[in-house]
Amino acid sequence: MPIRVPDELPAVNFLRNENVFVMTSSRAKTQEIRPLKVLVLNLMPKKIETENQFLRLLSNSPLQIDIQLLRIDSRESKNTPTEHLNNFYCNFDDIQDENFDGLIVTGAPLGLVDFCDVVYWPQIARVIEWAKEHVTSTLFVCWAVQAALNILYGIPKMTRKEKLSGVYLHQTLQPHALLTRGFDETFLAPHSRYADFPADVIRQHTDLDILVASEQAGAYLFASKDKRLAFVTGHPEYDVLTLAGEFFRDCDAGLDPTVPVNYFPEDNPELEPKASWRSHGHLLFVNWLNYYVYQITPYDLRKMNPTLD
């Protein structure tokens, strides 16, 4: 079954052009199926691009999914039309009394910003605390992982001296875990961050299971034993040209960025890169939806019984 989205959302035509089955809300109402309710807190500046990336991965599942987009930054956006935000996004006050099967919190370009200087830090803390009682399973991506580790476990912000950018080799540490079911023993995934996630720090300060790690990128995928929390420190949702766009943007800004590792053919930015992580990204999201959301969420969300302390 497909994802359910508002009829006029730009992602509808974008994904249909890729032969992705998208069901508009008007058509979905004719089916007597209880869809999974998934809330997406989109923290990225280019919201439409990020919507397309995540909805692509969420659509590759036999489950029908009702997507609700959430924003917590009330400032005027420089990268997304106000009309789009008004038409397709809700504010936290609109949904705070609702329950959801899943929540995805995206990354944000805040790698070198102290938590106390993040304008919407109180709001993101509120959402994460709210999710304990209102969401079956939450998936944090990249910067959101760092924020959640601080809010939930008190782990301070850790940053690298140089930005981690490129496509890195990862090792599946727990191949029989539900979230890694079907993963190759080694696979590639993109990263673009200053945040540092040393596996030993996560083991020392949390009870999370580290499922996948990388010698260069550190802990990549980890989760709580009750499946309520999942963390991915990279960007499996990225399009093939996303890293290139970031690299050339930084070049134009005079930042002299390092060429992303293992990305451009022959490390030559003039050559077009190829995506080597698509199958992994799809499998990760299908596993999360199936094993962490669908199989443990109640049919009646009013009867949600959270297990997270």
Swiss-Prot record:
Keyword terms of this UniProt record: Acyltransferase, Amino-acid biosynthesis, Cytoplasm, Methionine biosynthesis, Transferase
Alphabetized Gene3D superfamilies for the sequence: 3.40.50.880
Pfam families in the cross-refs: HTS
Upper classification of the organism: Bacteria, Pseudomonadati, Pseudomonadota, Gammaproteobacteria, Enterobacterales
This protein's name: Homoserine O-succinyltransferase
Pathway recorded for this protein: Amino-acid biosynthesis; L-methionine biosynthesis via de novo pathway; O-succinyl-L-homoserine from L-homoserine: step 1/1
Chief place where the protein resides: cytoplasm
Active site, per annotation: C142 (acyl-thioester intermediate), H235 (proton acceptor), E237
Reactions listed under catalytic activity: L-homoserine + succinyl-CoA = O-succinyl-L-homoserine + CoA
Cell compartments where the protein resides: Cytoplasm
EC identifiers of the protein: 2.3.1.46
Signal peptide from the UniProt entry: none
Keyword Amino-acid biosynthesis: yes
Gene: metAS
PANTHER family tied to this protein: HOMOSERINE O-SUCCINYLTRANSFERASE
Feature type site, description Important for acyl-CoA specificity: G111
Role played: Transfers a succinyl group from succinyl-CoA to L-homoserine, forming succinyl-L-homoserine.
Annotated residues for binding of substrate: K163, S192, R249
Alphabetical GO biological process terms: L-methionine biosynthetic process from homoserine via O-succinyl-L-homoserine and cystathionine
Family designation: Belongs to the MetA family.
GO cellular component: cytoplasm
